[in-house]
Amino acid sequence: MNKSKFLVYSSLVVFAIALGLFVYLVNASKALSYLSSDPKACINCHVMNPQYATWQHSSHAERASCVECHLPTGNMVQKYISKARDGWNHSVAFTLGTYDHSMKISEDGARRVQENCISCHASLSSTLLENADRNHQFNDPKGASERLCWECHKSVPHGKVRSLTATPDNLGVREVK
């Protein structure tokens, strides 16, 4: 076999192996699931089981998915930029073992969730607007003295996450259809 044919065949073999590894990693990591809005993508990592289980048993389970609360709404570009940035940060943290096992929301994540709480509840509930008090000033961009919704509404939607971390199988979260 001459040298040029050997290089072509060798290159094809290396490319095929690299492609096979790439396909395997995409499949093993369930990478395509992260492009969806399916809340089950959030439990690809066992660390999120308590958050998924508490959301699943909350009033929000029938009305809002994880991405509707945790990612920007309205602008698809911003949504996927945030999703990619968060995914990259999570991947690096889990790969290097530098993540906080108690899973605390980031400052940017808290801002997005707060904006989505206000957006969803301000548009859905005229009662809250009519009876607005100092804690529910939805029309004020700073809100009620910059309080976060979950400071008062502690059980929405994740409830007592810490108590679920010790629950065997986290309420059967893996069997959810």
Curated annotation (Swiss-Prot):
Binding site for heme 3: 117, 120-121
Entry keywords, A to Z: Cell inner membrane, Cell membrane, Electron transport, Heme, Iron, Membrane, Metal-binding, Transmembrane, Transmembrane helix, Transport
Periplasmic-side segments: 27-177
Subunit structure: Heterodimer with NrfA.
Native organism: Wolinella succinogenes (strain ATCC 29543 / DSM 1740 / CCUG 13145 / JCM 31913 / LMG 7466 / NCTC 11488 / FDC 602W) (Vibrio succinogenes)
Similarity annotation: Belongs to the NapC/NirT/NrfH family.
PANTHER family: CYTOCHROME C-TYPE PROTEIN (PTHR30333), CYTOCHROME C-TYPE PROTEIN NAPC (PTHR30333:SF1)
Any Pfam family the entry gives: Cytochrom_NNT
Name assigned to this protein: Cytochrome c-type protein NrfH
Compartment(s) where it occurs, according to its Swiss-Prot or TrEMBL record: Cell inner membrane
One GO BP: denitrification pathway
Binding site residues for substrate: 79, 86
Alphabetized GO MF terms: electron transfer activity; heme binding; metal ion binding
UniProt: heme 2 binding residues: 66, 69-70, 158
